Amino acid sequence: MCCYCVCCTVSDFILYIVAFFFPPAAVLLRSGPCSSDFLLNVLLTLLGFLPGMLHAFYYITITSPLRNAEYVYYYQQGWVDSERNVPSNRPQNSQTPQNRPQQGSSARNVYPSVETPLLQGAAPHDNKQSLVESPPPYVP
C-alpha cells in the first residue's frame, strides 16, 4: 500500500523522527552548524528536552519545501518610461464618426477612452465647452 502524505515531504518525515530522539541533530541537518536556529535549539534542549523538541518540530515545519509556494510573488511590468508617449513612425488613420468601427466588430481601439469626471457635476465631454472654469493661475 502506498502512503501519500500532502503535509510533509520524505525529508521532513525523517527529520521529525530524528527530532523526536535528538532535536539539535534535526535542526543541524536542516540549517547548518553555525546558524542561530541550531544554537537556539541546543540551548532549549539543555534547558529541557520538550522545549528543544517543540522548537525542532516548529523549525522543520517552517522550513519545509512545501511552504515555498506560499511566498511566491508575481510582479507585473508596468509602463516603461522610454516607450511611453513615443510617437510611432506609422501613419495614423484618421477616423471620422462615419468610418469608426462599430461596437461588435473585431477591430477595436488599442487604448479605449475612459471618461472620468474630475469634479462632481461636470458634464460628459460632448464636444461642448465645459461649464466648470479652470482655477486662476498661481502668482507669487
UniProtKB/Swiss-Prot annotation:
Organism: Saccharomyces cerevisiae (strain ATCC 204508 / S288c) (Baker's yeast)
Topology feature Cytoplasmic, residues: 1-8, 63-140
Topological region Vacuolar: 30-41
Phosphoserine modified-residue sites: S134
Keyword Transmembrane helix: yes
Membrane topology: Multi-pass membrane protein
TM stretches of this protein: 9-29, 42-62
PROSITE patterns: UPF0057
Keywords in alphabetical order: Isopeptide bond, Lipoprotein, Membrane, Palmitate, Phosphoprotein, Transmembrane, Transmembrane helix, Ubl conjugation, Vacuole
One Pfam short name: Pmp3
Family the UniProt entry places it in: Belongs to the UPF0057 (PMP3) family.
Protein location: Vacuole membrane
Protein name: Protein SNA4
InterPro entries found in the cross-reference section: PMP3 (IPR000612)
Annotated segments matching region Disordered: 84-140
